[in-house]
């Protein structure tokens, strides 16, 4: 079993020194991935292609799937190699292989040749094509748009009959560009933007800002692991988790409602910049698209970038949501993205679309930056290969109820702005207001003889916070499944 791997065209037009370096890196990447599945796979670099050989025919489908997902490969040919003596012998070998395939079809023959021979490529095409036409009565020659193109590569005394042509994903081999840090949330945008930088030749590390609970974190880790395993498993990468509950709580308490979105993003790029500096990473990657949400205006994006000490890359800046979702389906992250939560109470209800620097700086003046520093210092660093083991751990389940019992208290965990606008009213049960960002520090001070039913508008943050509390030993928590109307 043999494959001829063709490099991405942009690689081939580079200078000889750069082309050789890129081809060498791609060869190493292919070897790293394929030999995990088949130790006997041979990967050999040639001037304008890479040769992949394997004796294990049963691994064919797996090898094809792996090659199709390695950045830097434009396409690859599955070929059958045979020695020949003369042009007529090539025809006989070709006839034996394609006779059944050409029955009732139109066809043409295309030959590429290297080495010294008594015939040219065009002469070989005419001779072989004419012979096939004579010996297969139901087949007809058609040089333009045929049903079947018979492709033959001739090199010295060997011929390679191309059985199948497989498309690759193109791009540059991972390692030809510098490392980047992707801010991954588990949604459609961040997954696709991560993939786009991988395809462009960067090793992508992942940074996740956790707003509470294991369920969301596990979902995001699964997405990052999926992207890494499918498209960049040739390289080791890191997954960094930063607990941002305290930061969000500080913003909700001290920052003007309209400025919260921009301030939160500025805090995220500040934290990510510190992580990037630690690992000598030059750029951070976000999934923002111009105008997609209110915070993603040019004015706001410029102010967000001012808080970063690293280059901020936005590969999706001109993409429509439809395009992004279509790409997520192609790379296999759409199902995970659909299950990711939208947090209630995190982003302001009336965000500014044209933030003013002076106003942002004034609001940040109220912020205790020691909380941000503490979040970064306590970040968790994980080799992404460990995620597969970690996600197999049992996730604690939380009961959701719609009818309240006698010993139960409603715990409204929405932000103060939301509770003021739409208070939870219960004529039969006590209601305690405790914003979600205070639960970790204040829940333990409540009467633990009571059962607490957590409530938020969409039911997402309440579930995540209930999971967090259960993980920390509190068994007296449930989630209220009934929305306020």
From Swiss-Prot:
Pathway recorded for this protein: Cofactor biosynthesis; thiamine diphosphate biosynthesis
Functional description taken from the UniProt entry: Catalyzes the ATP-dependent transfer of a sulfur to tRNA to produce 4-thiouridine in position 8 of tRNAs, which functions as a near-UV photosensor. Also catalyzes the transfer of sulfur to the sulfur carrier protein ThiS, forming ThiS-thiocarboxylate. This is a step in the synthesis of thiazole, in the thiamine biosynthesis pathway. The sulfur is donated as persulfide by IscS.
Protein encoded by which gene: thiI
Family as reported in the entry's similarity comment: Belongs to the ThiI family.
Record's catalysed reaction(s): [ThiI sulfur-carrier protein]-S-sulfanyl-L-cysteine + a uridine in tRNA + 2 reduced [2Fe-2S]-[ferredoxin] + ATP + H(+) = [ThiI sulfur-carrier protein]-L-cysteine + a 4-thiouridine in tRNA + 2 oxidized [2Fe-2S]-[ferredoxin] + AMP + diphosphate; [ThiS sulfur-carrier protein]-C-terminal Gly-Gly-AMP + S-sulfanyl-L-cysteinyl-[cysteine desulfurase] + AH2 = [ThiS sulfur-carrier protein]-C-terminal-Gly-aminoethanethioate + L-cysteinyl-[cysteine desulfurase] + A + AMP + 2 H(+)
Binding site for ATP: 183-184, 265, 287, 296
Disulfide bonds: 344-456
Cellular location(s): Cytoplasm
Name the record gives this protein: tRNA sulfurtransferase
Biological process per Gene Ontology, one example term: thiazole biosynthetic process
All residue ranges annotated as the THUMP domain in the record: 61-165
Active site: 456
